[in-house]
Amino acid sequence: MSEGSSNSTHFGYKTVDAEKKADLVADVFHSVAAKYDIMNDVMSFGIHRLWKRFTIESAGARPGMKVLDLAGGTGDLTAKFSHIVGNTGQVTLADINDSMLKVGREKLRNRGVVGNVNYVQANAEALPFPDNHFDIITIAFGLRNVTDKDAAIRSMLRVLKPGGKLLILEFSKPQHDLMRKVYDLYSFKILPKMGDIITQDAGSYEYLAESIRMHPDQETLKGMMVDAGFEQVEYTNMTDGIVALHKGYKF
C-alpha cells in the first residue's frame, strides 16, 4: 500500500481503514455529482477549463486513437477527445462512482456526443481492460482520491499500448509562499462556505481541500510514475503549481 500502513490510509486529514476509503470517497461524489460542474466553475473561477484545454493539447490525440478518460466524471475531457478521434476512434469514460458516471453520460448524450464513447464503472487500481489497449490515458483531478496510487499507476501502465502516453492533471503544491498562504486561506475558509451555499454540503469541500494537501507533490508524483515503469516523465506547473500536469510514456 502506498499510503500509511498496509491496512490504513488517509481520507483528507483523517486516518481510516484502507478498505473504507473508497466508500467514504464515493459518499462525497454521490453528494456533489449533480452540481459538480457548477462548483468546478465557481471554485476555480473557470480556470479549470484552461487547465483541461492544456491537457487535451498535450495529449496529442489523433483520429483513430483509443483514449481512456479515467475518473472522467462529467465528461469534459471525453467530449473533446470524442471530436478529435472521430468515428474511427474510441473514447472510454471510466469512473468508480456511478453517480458521476450517470451525470456524465446524460450530459454528453444531451450534447450529441455519441457513437464513439462508451462508459465503464471501474476502479483505477484494477482496470478491467486488456493489456496494451489504449493510446492515451488521462486522469484529471481523480488520482488524489485513489487509495493505492501506486497500484493505479501500474494499472494504467499495463493497459497503455507501447508508445502510449499517460497524463495526470491534479492539484499540487504552489511554488511561492504568498500563493501558498492565499491558497490555504481560500481552500480552508472560503471553499467550504461556497460548497455549503451551492450544494448544501460543506463537508465534502472540506475533504477536497484536505485531500489536495495530502496528495504527493510534483517531484514525488514524478518519482512514483518512474518507479511504476513510465519513461520520459515530466510535469508542467500551472497557476504557480496549484495544478500540475504530469506526462509519461510507456515504451
From Swiss-Prot:
Binding positions for S-adenosyl-L-methionine per the UniProt entry: T74, D95, N123, A124
Record keywords, A-Z: Menaquinone biosynthesis, Methyltransferase, S-adenosyl-L-methionine, Transferase, Ubiquinone biosynthesis
Reactions this protein catalyses: a 2-demethylmenaquinol + S-adenosyl-L-methionine = a menaquinol + S-adenosyl-L-homocysteine + H(+); a 2-methoxy-6-(all-trans-polyprenyl)benzene-1,4-diol + S-adenosyl-L-methionine = a 5-methoxy-2-methyl-3-(all-trans-polyprenyl)benzene-1,4-diol + S-adenosyl-L-homocysteine + H(+)
GO MF terms held by the record: 2-methoxy-6-polyprenyl-1,4-benzoquinol methyltransferase activity; demethylmenaquinone methyltransferase activity
Entries under Pfam families matching the protein: Ubie_methyltran
UniProt EC number: 2.1.1.163, 2.1.1.201
PROSITE patterns on file: SAM_MT_UBIE, UBIE_1, UBIE_2
Highest taxon of source: Bacteria
Function comment: Methyltransferase required for the conversion of demethylmenaquinol (DMKH2) to menaquinol (MKH2) and the conversion of 2-polyprenyl-6-methoxy-1,4-benzoquinol (DDMQH2) to 2-polyprenyl-3-methyl-6-methoxy-1,4-benzoquinol (DMQH2).
NCBIfam families linked to this entry: MenG_MenH_UbiE (TIGR01934), PRK00216.1-1 (NF001240), PRK00216.1-3 (NF001242), PRK00216.1-5 (NF001244)
Name the record gives this protein: Ubiquinone/menaquinone biosynthesis C-methyltransferase UbiE
Originating species: Shewanella loihica (strain ATCC BAA-1088 / PV-4)
